[in-house]
């Protein structure tokens, strides 16, 4: 594959923080929507319950409830807050299902709305979803290897364009030179930031630009928007 931005690509440095209009509170299927975020939920439950097996059993309870009742009256605010409450609830419910001799004492003190561990799990999930979206963009735009370029640049921020070009050719099979990297990298950074913003918007209730900015900062992802107009 040979790289080179298409003629209609907008190599700019702007991000529309509220480009996406899809909010979790408007999802047709609560359980279906929440499936996107199984990874951080499973990690948090495994931390609380002591094993991924118990985490999976607790998740079944939570998803079963969402299938039957949807988001219910708690359908407001931030999705991550809704889910952390659900995690606490299903962890307790799972312990209640076990024989008394097999139950462990639950320490839910660290499973709070502002828990550093939960926020870390949540941030990693949103970033992973943005990376996968960037990779899909590359697959559908052969002349815009935005994922390959940004992936290589992120792995070694001090590498020169020539070094990055060689690495991309070797790891991703993309024929690219240093001048093309210098053109594509700004596009890749702006697109990745846009995809992060889109992910954040979908986890908030009818957010304003200020709401999205605040959530990005709270999740520790502001660096991805450095140098960009938002």
Regions found by a protein language model. Give the residues of each.
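Intrinsic, short, N-terminal disordered tails of RNA polymerase sigma-factor systems
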Residues: 1-230
């Amino acid at each position: 594959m040979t790289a080179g931005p298409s003629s209609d690509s907008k190599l700019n440095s702007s991000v529309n923080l509220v480009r996406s209009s899809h909010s979790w509170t408007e999802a047709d299927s609560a359980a279906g929507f929440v499936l996107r975020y199984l990874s951080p939920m499973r990690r948090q439950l495994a931390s609380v319950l002591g094993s991924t097996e118990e985490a999976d059993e607790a998740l079944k309870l939570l998803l079963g409830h969402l299938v039957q009742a949807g988001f219910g009256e708690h359908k407001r605010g931030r999705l991550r807050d809704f889910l952390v409450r659900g995690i606490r609830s299903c962890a307790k419910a799972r312990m209640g299902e076990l024989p008394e001799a097999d139950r462990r004492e639950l320490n839910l003190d660290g499973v709070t709305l502002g828990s550093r561990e939960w926020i870390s799990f949540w941030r990693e999930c949103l970033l992973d979803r943005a990376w996968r979206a960037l990779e899909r963009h590359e697959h559908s735009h052969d002349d815009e290897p935005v994922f390959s370029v940004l992936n290589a640049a992120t792995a070694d921020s001090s590498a020169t364009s020539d070094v990055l070009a060689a690495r991309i050719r070797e790891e991703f099979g993309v024929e690219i030179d240093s001048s093309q990297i210098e053109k594509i990298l700004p596009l890749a950074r702006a697109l990745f930031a846009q995809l992060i913003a889109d992910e954040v918007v979908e986890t908030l209730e009818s957010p304003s630009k200020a709401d999205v900015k605040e959530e990005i900062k709270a999740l520790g992802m502001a660096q991805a928007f450095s140098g960009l107009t938002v």
